[in-house]
Amino acid sequence: ELVRVGHDSLIGEIIRLEGDSATIQVYEETAGLTVNDPVLRTKKPLSCELGPGILGNIFDGIQRPLKTIAIKSRDVYIPRGVSVPALDKDQLWEFQPNKLGVGDNITNGDLYATVFENTLMKHHIALPPGAMGKISYIAPAGQYSLQDTVLELEFQGIKKEFTMLHTWPVRTPRPVASKLAADTPLLTGQRVLDALFPSVLGGTCAIPGAFGCGKTVISQALSKYSNSDTVVYVGCGERGNEMAEVLMDFPQLTMTLPDGREESVMKRTTLVANTSNMPVAAREASIYTGITIAEYFRDMGYNVSMMADSTSRWAEALREISGRLAEMPADSGYPAYLASRLASFYERAGKVQCLGSPDRTGSVTIVGAVSPPGGDFSDPVTSATLSIVQVFWGLDKKLAQRKHFPSVNWLISYSKYSTALEGYYEKFDPGFIDMRTKAREVLQREDDLNEIVQLVGKDALGESDKITLETAKLLREDYLAQNAFTPYDKYCPFYKSVWMMRNIIHFNQLANQAVERAANADGHKITYAVVKSRMGDLFYRLVSQKFEDPAEGEDVLVAKFQKLYDDLTAGFRNLEDEAR
């Protein structure tokens, strides 16, 4: 239960009741509280206000709007005991009721109106869970604030009024009709993730990595370029300047819509900032606040992705609270219920059939960054997370030091959604699954060969192994590595990823075939050195595939890639003819 503590009315939450004494966790600095200070009960649990005005806003861990507080207090810090409503109650919103009239029956989850939130997102107003009845009044189209009654229901003789706003306790998952199997990929615009380790809309992913490996850059790239409708970005216990960077970057970033309009990314983003210099207790609440907001948009039928950066800090907050309660510590001092808390958070992700009519599906994708101390993946938080999530994008310190970004290690990462997405890939491009398998084999083979090369040198290898090493280098440096700060490579559409991979694998197959055929024939031998010297021009074109700018349009790019594919085939045919 939420309470107000002391004369400053600080926000607190009761976390344990024993006999007639209550343990209260206060979400603010508690200096100056004395014995016999009053405690006011609010008689409701820690809740989130859900309604128009969430998008483009920035909240702290217990949903206090930081912008409004800054304007009111004119201070860089949040004053103690400040009480500001989460959403602006006076702002007017354009309300448009759906085709419902007085006398119609309506139940929880039914969408009864649309509100114009911004040029990018339509905000659907649904009946809150647990409500039902016959409409006795519905407001006509017009402008209303969040305090105005827009709907009145009658059920068993009792009338109940509804505004566009409702509250929901953050620790309770919002109800759904049913959970569905996810079958659409979450396209991130990062080649290594889309092609080798795909996630789905409604999936769970973990990004563990030591400091400086680029976790934050990957989660920001997901917020900027992924194919989800809205993004909730929770900065939980990370540095304050990272949230400041997001606040500076996002309003300037634009995304191009299918109809060619440019819109600011901020219009589809909500930020929950609980940086490392804010109270630890609110850090634990911030993740729940974020997921509740995400579920609210999911219930409208949107695909939402939620970034939690980072869940390790959240686990540390749990450890601290558990220590104050004098509970029995488990591994590394974390509480024994760490794994179940993590699981209860991650299982709120998924693709669902929403309650109510019209029929709609929505999804919540959770991407959790984990920062294990010293990059040690056997840390309790990391191992508990890995037993829950389905996609693991492991970041490697050595790759980051080589300036290979995104530094996802392709030998330890995995995705358990590959089979679920096979249907989608078959439709998109029937040959893609085989190409991906081949690319993985090449990268794995390179890892095996590296030890031999270090012992005896590259020249002692067979011709096909030399070609494998060259293909792996192409894949590594020109396919998996991606520069997030260039216009042509910050976002890579899926068709470009597929075509780039196709041409590299095609080169590998043709080179191997040429070497094998010439070895059995009587003419000149074709060696790796011959291929490299004669194919210099085509090789250069393979390397520079990534410089093709998606802004030119899909047809232009596909034509270029197709021409390279045909030129490769012709080039090797000529080489073989000459060798005869």
From Swiss-Prot:
Matching entries from CDD domains are given as: ATP-synt_V_A-type_alpha_C, V_A-ATPase_A
Q: Is ATP-binding given among the entry's keywords? A: yes
Tell me what reaction this enzyme catalyses: ATP + H2O + 4 H(+)(in) = ADP + phosphate + 5 H(+)(out)
EC number annotated for this UniProt entry: 7.1.2.2
> Which PROSITE patterns does the entry link to?
ATPASE_ALPHA_BETA
Keyword vocabulary terms for this entry:
ATP-binding, Hydrogen ion transport, Ion transport, Nucleotide-binding, Translocase, Transport
One GO BP annotation is: ATP metabolic process
Entry's transmembrane regions: none
Q: Which GO terms describe its molecular function?
A: ATP binding; ATP hydrolysis activity; proton-transporting ATPase activity, rotational mechanism
One Pfam match: ATP-synt_ab_N
Q: Which top-level group of life is the source organism from?
A: Eukaryota
What does it do? Catalytic subunit of the peripheral V1 complex of vacuolar ATPase. V-ATPase vacuolar ATPase is responsible for acidifying a variety of intracellular compartments in eukaryotic cells.
Residues annotated to bind ATP? G209, A210, F211, G212, C213, G214, K215, T216
Q: Which family does it belong to?
A: Belongs to the ATPase alpha/beta chains family.
> What is the designated name of this protein?
V-type proton ATPase catalytic subunit A
An example of a Gene Ontology cellular component annotation for this protein is: plant-type vacuole
Q: Kindly indicate whether the keyword Ion transport belongs to this entry.
A: yes
Q: Which Gene3D superfamilies match?
A: 2.30.30.650, 2.40.50.100, Bovine Mitochondrial F1-atpase, Atp Synthase Beta Chain, Chain D, domain 3 (1.10.1140.10), P-loop containing nucleotide triphosphate hydrolases (3.40.50.300)
Q: How does it assemble?
A: V-ATPase is a heteromultimeric enzyme composed of a peripheral catalytic V1 complex (main components: subunits A, B, C, D, E, and F) attached to an integral membrane V0 proton pore complex (main component: the proteolipid protein).
